[in-house]
Amino acid sequence: MEEKIFSRPAASATVLVGTQFGDEGKGKLVDYLSDKYDIVVRYQGGANAGHTICFDGKTVVLHLIPSGIFNKDCICVIGNGVVIDPNALMDEIKKVEELGYDVKGRLYISHNAHLIMPYHKRLDSLSESCLSGDNKIGTTGRGIGPSYEDKFARKGIRVVDLLDRDVLKEKLRENLAAKNKLISKVYEQEEIDVEAIIREYEEFDKAIDPYVTNTQLFLNRQIKAGKTILLEGAQGCLLDVDHGTYPFVTSSNPTSGGACTGSGVAPNHVGKIIGVCKAYTTRVGNGDFPTELDDETGEALGRIGCEFGATTGRKRRCGWLDLVALRYSVTVSGVTELALTKLDVLDTFEEIKVCTSYMLDGKEIFDFPTEHQTLSRVQPVYKSLKGWMASNAKAKSFAEMHPNAQAYVNFLEEALEVPVTFISVGPGRDETVFK
């Protein structure tokens, strides 16, 4: 009896997390893995995160719909932890359908997911405009933060409210009565027309209704039926509102713990946790970045890696791989294996550096401090590795990769004590090596 009580259920779910500041290349991995799983779930964030997928000579950027939508046998779910801009969602559905992929019957949206309203976007921009210089958070202006603020203040409007016009009108009028006072009295800006928003959002109910369901119930029934689930995170661990470089973070939990609260899938159903990291480091917007390179090397990384934000188009800051930060992310999210992306960006570097520790006030430290007042003062300590000066794009196995590229991967495994199982050696689906 004791053995039965304490036995662990067979794991049905895998979590995929970014282990840096976002933009790690999760889209390619999800696209590749989607034919191995029955269901792909997006569990947090909103249209502030872009996942880029390259296939059949096309490059597609998705912000809300899970990357698995391009596998015709895969069911995609937008979970309760996501905040949804209905305009962005409908545009994305149209984009996918224009590419020849049927969405109906394959896309499910949580009835409990919160909505991003026009006043959220307005307040997002107004709030950011009041901050100066380095204090700016670097928000995308998509209304993500204000929507989450309303969610936790218990004032949010959810997808289920969109389907009941009377409830929608009541909640919109109640919310805008308060928001307009803030906009006019504090920010001294023109108030938002309540009736115009009501008219606009009333039209979304028919368009979104076919996709809406209780996804928590749906997912757990699928687990009982033996289906497998891939839980896809947006952004990265270092942007987590609780565990990231606060205050320069996102408004949700990209770490693996957020996968459960943002989907309704319990932790005991999770088996593997795959961490995705670039072979170097990038960051968009403000915030501490110990290995940032403001020189020709940083410029080269950005140019070769095409480092521009998929959502905002902003130029990404670039630097060497930071093992101190990466080790922290691996620990916080309980990463069981790593997927290394954009290794090909390093193909032309004779010398490659990796940060192995920091110097802080004359002392060497190995733990990652998330607080700005400490992280802003650290200096990276680097280990130099030999570059490979060759392409690995045609390699079909780890053994076929250049010996120095193999040495780089092996070094990361030893330093992080986590196996690297997936190596992206180019943007295409077939430019992938498994270890």
UniProtKB/Swiss-Prot annotation:
Pfam families membership: Adenylsucc_synt
Pathway(s) where this gene product acts: Purine metabolism; AMP biosynthesis via de novo pathway; AMP from IMP: step 1/2
Positions annotated as active site in the UniProt record: 23, 51
Binding residue positions for GTP: 22-28, 50-52, 316, 342-344, 424-426
Main location (coarse class): cytoplasm
Reactions it catalyzes: IMP + L-aspartate + GTP = N(6)-(1,2-dicarboxyethyl)-AMP + GDP + phosphate + 2 H(+)
Keywords of the record: Cytoplasm, GTP-binding, Ligase, Magnesium, Metal-binding, Nucleotide-binding, Purine biosynthesis
Residues where Mg(2+) binds: 23, 50
UniProt keyword annotation of NAD present: no
EC numbers for this chain: 6.3.4.4
Entry-linked InterPro entries: Adenylosuccin_syn_GTP-bd, Adenylosuccin_syn_Lys_AS, Adenylosuccinate_synth_dom1, Adenylosuccinate_synth_dom2, Adenylosuccinate_synth_dom3, Adenylosuccinate_synthetase, P-loop_NTPase
Reported function: Plays an important role in the de novo pathway of purine nucleotide biosynthesis. Catalyzes the first committed step in the biosynthesis of AMP from IMP.
Assembly description: Homodimer.
The protein's name in its UniProt record: Adenylosuccinate synthetase
Native organism: Chlorobaculum tepidum (strain ATCC 49652 / DSM 12025 / NBRC 103806 / TLS)
Organism phylogeny: Bacteria, Pseudomonadati, Chlorobiota, Chlorobiia, Chlorobiales
